[in-house]
Amino acid sequence: MKDRGNKNTSKTRPTVKSRRTRKTTKPSTERKKNVTTKTTIRNNRLQNNLSSQTVQTDKPVDSATARAFPQHTSPDIKFNKEKYRNNAIYAHSKLRKISNAVFHQDKEINRFSAFTDKPLADLSFNMPVKTSTTQKKEIVKSTECQRQDPNAVNAFKIFQSYETSPPYSPCSPKNFMSEIYRLFRCYNASIVQIQVYSRNKILINAMQEKLMSIGNMVINVGEQIISESVHHEPVVAIAINQFFRGTVPHTDALRKNAVAPIPVNASKKKLVGICSLMINAPTEKDLLCAAHVCINFAICHPNEITLNIAKLTQPMLLREHITIYNSFNKYIYWDDYGKLLN
């Protein structure tokens, strides 16, 4: 008889899957395939949506969107040129940076307001370049006026000269160039003017000849004339300050007194011996080259030249330079404006 209780038999039975295993294996495999298929479909839809958004449309894409979402923009960004014509150029280009620049400047001025009560020579060497002006009117002492060099041009020479001035002082060439860079970030060259003052006419003529070797220059040279010098009464000084501050009501009589000139003898006018040189240019390139020429003269003759820079209220543009101005700004504000932003 066969021993049925013995489980160890000589014949090996083939392994047979249970009914439960056979039922669950096939559906799990199909479920994995379905999940993979759905994932692939979802990815394809996402790629199709992104590719459809990259198609160029009539609407211009701003620079912020182009930087944050480069996949949403095409390589050749086209802007609406109507936005950048006529007076709208500033509204969509450099004036966008004015608010940040002015806010930063006011912040630095408030930060270093403790230095405004000191004379210019006592300012710290670590003073930022942008805080070249102070919010308080300064008074020049009579003793310093007596020690003033007769060949000096203006009151800045009382405090310091180009040779002894720190690199961040208002008289330094570095501060002059810094102000030019700051203005060019906000405005174009048509409303920026460089002013040069000197008692040496030969030096002014040499600078004029050097500037004439630069293209697109507009130069105005002349000697300063002053009228008869008179002192104002204290009542006049107080009244005009009250008029500007608005501490008194603006009546017709007050306005008339504020704008009424002090009568003097016109025949007592005289030449003071100071030659002034005004420099304008239609483009930033030309005016920057002129600024470097002025800086070189100021470094070689530190005690004979005073440099200044002014922001005009309206553009100074000649008829001969209109085409140059338009062609230069066309590359910045119209055709390649989107590419330059990136």
Curated annotation (Swiss-Prot):
Q: Which residues cross the membrane?
A: none
InterPro entries linked: Herpes_IE2_3 (IPR005028)
- Return the protein name: Protein U84
- Location of region: Disordered: 1-37
Basic residues: compositionally biased ranges: 14-25
* Gene Ontology BP terms: regulation of DNA-templated transcription
**Family per UniProt?**
Belongs to the herpesviridae U84 family.
